[in-house]
């Protein structure tokens, strides 16, 4: 996989032929010398320990680990919470709140042994029982956790625990969360999880931010509001929230009660301030003024003038495992015909989008599962039937017009006006404006609905849109993480795609046999792309500005910034 990154990056890990090897790209580490962006304060050995300020998103939709599905929320969650296991800076699974773990010979029983002396940020004790509570809370349909099936679906008795959900994810029987086969020992020292089928990447799942524990006392005392105020926000990671001004900033302070897998001797900054900015111009100004030492939202019109890190600059472009796609609301009559969906897809010049609109910071997509995702022998993208979308745009456009006519809409006649919903950040609005023109060439009228980030994602999840920009960054390196999104009833299936053959292929992939696992996932992707259940647009890169003064942080192939060890040099 092509990577444009800084000097001290971790290279793509070797691909293993072992079942679900989960090799992945390593992330970018922080660079050299020193200047602005720190909080005034003490220094020790050339290290400013007071703190630093960054921007990687606006107001988070939620910081409840069970409810979050956005990358900006996850970036904060991995700093203030800690799951059973962690992914370290070398992309290795290491102990988090669990000091060790073991798996039975049949691969079904996972036993985690907790560290001694674990504490919540309020100083109260934490043990395996808190994880049992948190996982059973997540499986409860009343929690409405979008990742419940992805994270817990392989655990024994999941279906009963979730109330035997139907194709839309709604329970068909009384849910029984306590039935989920997750059990803490009486002394809280061990957590035993029994799976319904072997899942060799379950250690990576146990390191996923969504699998972080939440404190039962504060959740039950404060309801959904528990995670909206520092007064009620209890966490267990190396930092905790001490100040939160919506639309302005969140201040994280070093957690004095932290016990866990991160090296406490490397957690040196007293505070990390997160600027909650949605306007990329404001983010850029914060960086140029020295207020922030890292900003993710860079104005796209500034990119041509920026100097890349490998050329001695402070602009970084780093490949991540994910796909930018467009969701069609398949519950709308306008999109029920696969010929229409294919026409809309074929009318998009993806090379123009990636290289002109997105200025080469993304790569044109020809499938939903992109490069870098491993297969039994190599990469899934290379071993499958991609490209599903030809690079010959002129031929594609002619085919699009033909399909639209076959669907009963010659030159778009009789087709309803449709609306494209997006938040206004990065390339989202320029892409929407391009789609207006591209689909206009088919005779289709597209309007644009620009929304605030905090309201956009709930509306998309609720199906309150016609067409919406979407995307997915992988949580672990297996194609199932991307393809599972499109299962009937999946909480992240925003387009409400549903095909029994696709679901059957996904179900058949949940086996210990590696060859069969990947064969069924290839079959599932074939079905999804033949249906054009979503419109793949581009493969993700992250791009950001970072001052050379910021040390100790790293960027992962899953789009996360790890700030735990961050500090300002000088």
Where are these regions (language model features)?
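N-terminal lobe/hinge region of extracytoplasmic solute-binding protein
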Residues: 55-105, 234
């Amino acid at each position: 996989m092509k990577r444009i990154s800084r000097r001290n990056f971790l290279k793509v890990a070797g691909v293993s032929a072992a079942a679900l090897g989960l090799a992945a790209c390593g992330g970018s580490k922080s660079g050299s010398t020193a200047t602005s962006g720190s909080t005034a304060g003490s220094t020790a050995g050339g290290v400013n320990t007071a703190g630093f300020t960054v921007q990687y998103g606006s107001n988070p939709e939620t910081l409840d680990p069970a409810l979050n599905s956005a990358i900006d929320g996850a970036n904060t969650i991995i700093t203030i919470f800690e799951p059973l296991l962690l992914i370290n800076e070398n992309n290795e699974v290491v102990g988090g709140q669990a000091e060790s773990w073991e798996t039975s010979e049949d691969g079904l029983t996972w036993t985690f042994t907790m560290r001694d002396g674990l504490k919540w940020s309020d100083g109260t004790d934490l043990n395996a029982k808190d994880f049992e509570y948190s996982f059973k809370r997540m499986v409860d349909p009343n929690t409405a956790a979008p990742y419940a099936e992805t994270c817990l679906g392989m655990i024994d008795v999941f279906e009963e625990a979730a109330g035997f959900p139907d194709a839309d994810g709604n329970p068909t029987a009384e849910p029984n969360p306590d039935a989920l086969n997750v059990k803490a020992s009486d002394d809280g020292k061990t957590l035993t999880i029994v799976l319904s089928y072997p899942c060799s990447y379950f250690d990576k799942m146990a390191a996923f931010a969504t699998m972080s524990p939440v404190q039962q006392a504060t959740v039950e005392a404060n309801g959904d509001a528990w995670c909206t105020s520092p007064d009620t926000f209890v966490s267990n990671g190396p930092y905790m929230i001490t100040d939160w001004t919506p639309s302005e900033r969140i201040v994280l302070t070093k957690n004095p009660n932290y016990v866990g897998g991160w090296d406490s001797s490397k957690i040196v900054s007293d505070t990390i301030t997160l600027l909650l900015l949605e306007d990329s111009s404001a983010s850029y100004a914060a960086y140029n003024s020295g207020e922030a030492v890292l900003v993710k939202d860079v104005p796209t019109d500034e990119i041509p003038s920026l100097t890349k890190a490998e050329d001695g600059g402070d602009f970084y472009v780093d490949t991540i495992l994910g796909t930018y796609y467009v969701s069609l609301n398949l519950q709308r009559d306008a999109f029920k015909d696969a010929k229409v969906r294919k026409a809309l897809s074929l009318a998009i010049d993806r090379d123009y989008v990636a290289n002109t609109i997105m200025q080469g910071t993304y790569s044109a997509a020809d499938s939903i599962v992109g490069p870098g995702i491993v297969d039994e022998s190599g990469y899934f993208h290379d071993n499958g039937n991609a490209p599903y979308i030809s690079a010959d745009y002129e031929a594609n456009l002619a085919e699009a017009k033909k399909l639209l006519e076959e669907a009963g809409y010659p030159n778009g006649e009789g087709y309803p006006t449709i609306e494209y919903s997006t938040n206004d950040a990065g390339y989202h609005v320029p892409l929407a404006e391009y789609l207006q023109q591209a689909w206009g060439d088919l005779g289709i009228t597209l309007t644009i609905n620009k929304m605030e980030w905090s309201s956009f994602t709930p509306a998309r999840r609720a199906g309150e849109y016609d067409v919406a920009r979407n995307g997915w960054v992988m949580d672990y390196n297996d194609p199932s993480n991307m393809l599972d999104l499109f299962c009937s009833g999946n909480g992240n299936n925003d387009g409400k795609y549903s095909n029994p053959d696709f679901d059957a292929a996904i179900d058949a992939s949940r086996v210990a046999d590696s060859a069969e696992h990947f064969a069924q996932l290839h079959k599932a992707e074939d079905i999804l792309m033949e249906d054009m259940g979503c419109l793949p647009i581009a493969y993700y890169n992250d791009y950001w500005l970072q001052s050379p003064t910021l040390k100790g942080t790293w960027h992962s192939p899953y789009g996360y910034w790890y700030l735990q060890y961050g500090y300002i040099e000088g």
